[in-house]
């Protein structure tokens, strides 16, 4: 696991966009994993800006979303498929149908989850997965207590997550769905490269557990310690509880530019 402490979200976005740009050039049919929430927004803005300048193209790429609310109507503005289209996919040149997500409207939830797992496998797997992290250490909607071997499934959201997400629903916690479909921790771990973004002091405890704590289902993100290629990009506030912060700064400063993330 590599920890990169950056001045702010813009610096993190530039690093991630560089990495994705290199992937788009290197792979004939690259597969991205897309997260929602506030953490990746600066990355999506940077990628859209580079697309507008003709620096990157997603025409040959595919993408898979991490999760989706259950029960929101298809036209709801906070349905994650709508959010991804608005914040990123609709601003670049993905081919029609190239961006897929779990079907939160499916009547047969188990079948929908199995089909989504199969679609990811059939694509050849995710080359680069973007992640955020919850204040309680959840990634995607794998809440504390989630099985470290879990696959795509339906989950009940914790009250903490619903409170955290209420800002997207006009501050109304009751408007936040109680259930979701989410990629499991084992599904996420199958990605070849994972890039996790976090900013703000509110994420400091979760980042401390992720990087320096014991692997535990109570802090689901800690499973990433077992992945061979994880990049954790954090601002100074999110890094404020890291005991080895100076070491992480030193090792990244000494890293050759050609190596990238």
From Swiss-Prot:
It catalyses: alpha-D-glucosamine 6-phosphate + H2O = beta-D-fructose 6-phosphate + NH4(+). The keyword Transferase does not apply. Its EC number is 3.5.99.6. Catalyzes the reversible isomerization-deamination of glucosamine 6-phosphate (GlcN6P) to form fructose 6-phosphate (Fru6P) and ammonium ion. HAMAP family: GlcN6P_deamin. Pathway: Amino-sugar metabolism; N-acetylneuraminate degradation; D-fructose 6-phosphate from N-acetylneuraminate: step 5/5. Belongs to the glucosamine/galactosamine-6-phosphate isomerase family. NagB subfamily. It comes from the Bacteria. SUPFAM superfamilies: NagB/RpiA/CoA transferase-like. One of its GO terms (cellular component) is cytoplasm. The keyword Signal does not apply. Keywords: Carbohydrate metabolism, Hydrolase. The gene is nagB. This is Glucosamine-6-phosphate deaminase. It holds the Pfam family Glucosamine_iso. The lineage of its organism: Bacteria, Bacillati, Actinomycetota, Actinomycetes, Micrococcales. Coiled coil: none annotated. InterPro entries: Glc/Gal-6P_isomerase, Glucosamine6P_isomerase, Glucosamine6P_isomerase_CS, NagB/RpiA_transferase-like. One of its GO terms (molecular function) is glucosamine-6-phosphate deaminase activity. The active site is at 67 (proton acceptor), 136 (for ring-opening step), 138 (proton acceptor), 143 (for ring-opening step).
